[in-house]
Amino acid sequence: MDRDSPFADPDRSDPLPAPSNTLKASIFAQSRIVHPSTSVYNQFGRHRHDDIGQESFHEGIQPSVASLANLQGSYTAKSIHPHHSAIGLRNSSYDDHGDDADEQDPEDLLSDEELGLIAGDARNPSASLSYASNRSRKRRTNPSDPRSRASAVGGLSAKQKALWMWANVDNLDAFLQEVYAYYVGRGAICIALSRSLNLLTVAFVICFSTFLFGCIDYSSIRHDGQLSDVIVGHCVAGFSPFATLVVVLLLAAFGWQAVQFVLGLSRLRAMHRFYEQLLGIPDADVQSIPWHEVVNRLSALRDQHPTTSLSSADEMELGQRTSSSLRRSHPQPLDAHDVANRIMRQENYLIALFNENILDLSVPGLRSRSPSLTRSLEWNLHFCLLGFLFDSNGQVRHAFLSERYRADLIEGLRRRFLFMAVVNAIFAPFIVLYLLLYSFFRYFEEYHKDPSNLGSRQYTQYARWKFREFNELPHLFRRRCRTSYVAASKYMDQFPKEKTAIVARFVAFVAGSFTAVLLLASVMDPDVFVHFNITPQRNVLFYIGVFGAILAVARGMIPDEHVVFEPEAMLREVIEQTHYLPQDWKGRFHSAQVHQAFGQLYTLKIYIFLQELLSVVTTPFVLWLSLPACAPDLIDFLRKYTVHVDGLGHVCSFAVFDFARQPTASTMGGAAAKGIHRQQQQQQQQQQQSGGSGRTRAPRNGMSQAKMEQSILGFRANHPDWDPAAHASTASIQRVDDDAGATTLQYGHGDGRSTSDAPTGVGAGAKVKDLIDHIYRGSGGAAGASRW
């Protein structure tokens, strides 16, 4: 490799092959993990089937296949965020002018070899094929070519169109994200219906709010009047310049969303064909089929048609091409781990950053300086950090992998934070106004119907990122959080509040006494109920309502006498589901400090809503004052914990379950674990002695809830068909198993403990063996108390 490449290691020459009889050589011979600093990359990768137009130049091709030579174009979708999918929003890269009612099977028209060509399995490439590919690329960029893509695709059956789309996937990350978004959206009909109704909701909020605030003369309202008497004619013409600007901006945003929705319908239709024709999943079954079954069918499709126009991650990043013999002999499989890594390539970095406490999300000037994450701040993090780290193809930029660009990257990241701080400050009034209007229409009916929902709780955005595990897809994470809600609510309610209960009993007694007297007086003389005023303009009915409300609130604060208080048991049940157990919680489940700390993670919905509104004002300060100071640590972390996986590209090293690179205390020997623990205590003492204010960062590679061990166990539970032994991480685990000292890990209640007096020799690495035993004993169900 060129020494000037950002991937090259300037301090080492070309590596010499290690003896094949060593354990280290056997491990890395099986592993696909290559760190960016390594100067030699595995050349076995998928080749790119550049254009399906090659097929017309292949020997012996039949006339029926020759018609497919006119198919131009490729699937070139950009990288798509899973929570903002491009299905139904982005413009389609192909048109659907064909008749989907054509039920003729492509196997009736094409031979097996020709079907392999359609799916990208081109055999024996020659110079003529290369020439044809170049010629087809030129035709693809020429809009005046009569053999356009739309006319060519229009003559195919539904299954042939699906095969053509699969054969021309250029960006596998974006394609898999659309496949996942289609699954989460519950099929084409549900996605189209949901997005169309969302558009109508936005239109209703804009129109109804404009009518209420600008088209009604509230001073003319009378008890005996009519609606027509208070409506202002031509009210829009009388708007102030600011009100007109707000309406124009809202209408422009609505129009943009409507155009994107219409243009994305063709892609939604194409994804419907892909599910139905190639994966064999009709729209009615998308709502009930488990995700791991969808992944199995994707893997089977990849095994059947291993070579598409998809370029491997190596080719995309390095511009390299491998020989056709290597391509045919080393097809790259697509397993559940690869699918999850591609879908969550960006989110895995955020999970790692929150797990390592690198981001300073505190509002400057506040005394507590506790981290506060809202949806608006989360969106800004995606734009500033992930938008800077990844290019337009969804791949890590090369500059982040070399230390020589460190200063430029730090300065660039700081500028992005400062720029977005200014943008957020400018648009803050519009965002607050829209949030207030939308939330009022959205939640008023819910709380009016059931006022008790005002006291309901949910996890904060910060808690969700702390709980989430590597390669855990959003729908699986939501399911895990929902299973903990009952226990979490019981823990918050059952925690003894004797002081509050004593005061509540007194308030309930006083309010109940007043209510009883007023009700008794109303029964004895019904006229008193309405006509007798206790205070000016306030009759008996009014005060019965006031004291009744106070009585209801006070009774709600008094615990049931028959309830058995078990806060420790409830918190343990929560930990079994959330897999979150900080070090300072252990042995203190009964304490008020732990109850308060958990209450900050599982807080009232009304508080979260107020925090979202307030964050519109505080986000510019966080972006301007707090986050720029984190830029050096962020750049260093991204460079250090980015690895290269053949066929997958650059990903977060935590997401590949590379225990050899991130040795936590639970994967190391007892002595090593104690060394890490001592290092933690020393750093904490130094921070206390220096009186350091602001954020406190947990030591890297320390005992931070054994995040990777939890992730691999949870991933195995959610994907029962995934074989860890066939994955590269198994080699890393095996190396730790041979080299590490004796250690044990207890998964009950998520409490990991390392011991130094465990047996050695044959019993060395007992933790890793225990981890593997847990994986292979798993039944495939959701992770529960038996594993955690």
From Swiss-Prot:
GO terms for biological process: lipid transport; mitophagy; piecemeal microautophagy of the nucleus; protein localization to phagophore assembly site; reticulophagy. It catalyses: a 1,2-diacyl-sn-glycero-3-phosphocholine(in) = a 1,2-diacyl-sn-glycero-3-phosphocholine(out); a 1,2-diacyl-sn-glycero-3-phospho-L-serine(in) = a 1,2-diacyl-sn-glycero-3-phospho-L-serine(out); a 1,2-diacyl-sn-glycero-3-phosphoethanolamine(in) = a 1,2-diacyl-sn-glycero-3-phosphoethanolamine(out); a 1,2-diacyl-sn-glycero-3-phospho-(1D-myo-inositol-3-phosphate)(in) = a 1,2-diacyl-sn-glycero-3-phospho-(1D-myo-inositol-3-phosphate)(out). The keyword Nucleus does not apply. Residues 1-14 have a biased composition (Basic and acidic residues). Residues 679-689 have a biased composition (Low complexity). Residues 125-134 have a biased composition (Polar residues). The keyword Cytoplasm does not apply. GO terms for cellular component: autophagosome; cytoplasmic vesicle membrane; endoplasmic reticulum membrane; Golgi membrane; phagophore assembly site; phagophore assembly site membrane. Keywords: Autophagy, Cytoplasmic vesicle, Endoplasmic reticulum, Golgi apparatus, Lipid transport, Membrane, Transmembrane, Transmembrane helix, Transport. Residues 1-22, 87-108, 124-153, 307-332, 668-706, 742-762 are annotated as: Disordered. Residues 97-108 have a biased composition (Acidic residues). Residues 1-195, 257-416, 438-500, 560-605, 627-788 are cytoplasmic. It is a multi-pass membrane protein. It holds the Pfam family ATG9. InterPro entries: Autophagy-rel_prot_9. Phosphorylated by ATG1. ATG1 phosphorylation is required for preautophagosome elongation. Residues 217-235, 522-538 are lumenal. Its main location: membrane. Forms a homotrimer with a solvated central pore, which is connected laterally to the cytosol through the cavity within each protomer. Acts as a lipid scramblase that uses its central pore to function: the central pore opens laterally to accommodate lipid headgroups, thereby enabling lipid flipping and redistribution of lipids added to the outer leaflet of ATG9-containing vesicles, thereby enabling growth into autophagosomes. Phospholipid scramblase involved in autophagy and cytoplasm to vacuole transport (Cvt) vesicle formation. Cycles between the preautophagosomal structure/phagophore assembly site (PAS) and the cytoplasmic vesicle pool and supplies membrane for the growing autophagosome. Lipid scramblase activity plays a key role in preautophagosomal structure/phagophore assembly by distributing the phospholipids that arrive through ATG2 from the cytoplasmic to the luminal leaflet of the bilayer, thereby driving autophagosomal membrane expansion. Required for mitophagy. This is Autophagy-related protein 9. It comes from Mycosarcoma maydis.
